[in-house]
């Protein structure tokens, strides 16, 4: 599973995006922060949505996952202890990309583009026509329908 955040600054929102490696099935959850507690909750919701825990999860260098690269030698990173304990508890391996190599997570990066331009921008326009703004509640309700019927 490849995991990333995508930011929507005009709406003061971020979206947690998880894309499975082989099927490319994706899960999206809109949030108002990218704190460790939010990241853990989003993972649990993604695992529930997919019906199980992925064997490996791939991340970029987000501070909620990795504190310092190569802290204990090449390829031996200092991980956020809360996140490391969470991964052990759930039973998945943590993999991290090399810095500035977002293409390593190409599946989730491609889906982020699709989410932004096929879903989020369309939702903003649809809601603006009714004098509404995108918020966590309406974005999460609509994105689940979109994931199940379109994406």
Model-found features: residue ranges?
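Mobile-element integrase/transposase regions
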Residues: 1-26, 35-41, 88
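Short small-residue beta-strand/loop micro-motif enriched in glycine and branched aliphatics
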Residues: 24-29, 67
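Active-site beta-loop-alpha junctions of metal-dependent nucleic acid enzymes
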Residues: 28-56, 76-77
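Acidic/histidine-rich, metal-coordinating catalytic segments
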Residues: 53-74
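Short secondary-structure boundary/capping segments
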Residues: 71-76, 111-115
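Two-metal-ion acidic nuclease core segments, chiefly of the RNase H-like superfamily
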Residues: 75-94
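Charged alpha-helix within mobile-element recombinases
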Residues: 91-151
């Amino acid at each position: 599973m490849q995991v990333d955040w995508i930011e929507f600054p005009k709406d003061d929102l971020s979206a947690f995006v998880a894309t499975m490696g082989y099927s490319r099935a994706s899960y999206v959850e809109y949030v108002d922060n990218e704190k460790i507690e939010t990241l853990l909750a989003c993972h649990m919701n993604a695992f529930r949505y997919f019906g199980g825990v992925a064997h490996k999860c791939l991340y970029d260098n987000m501070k909620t996952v990795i504190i310092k690269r190569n802290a204990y030698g090449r390829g031996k990173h200092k991980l956020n202890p809360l996140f490391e304990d969470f991964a052990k508890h759930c039973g998945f391996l943590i993999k991290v990309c090399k810095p500035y190599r977002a293409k390593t997570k190409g599946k989730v990066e491609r889906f982020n583009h699709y989410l932004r331009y096929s879903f989020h921008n369309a939702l903003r326009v649809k809601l603006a026509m009714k004098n509404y703004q995108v918020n966590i509640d309406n974005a999460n309700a609509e994105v689940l329908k979109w994931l199940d019927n379109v994406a």
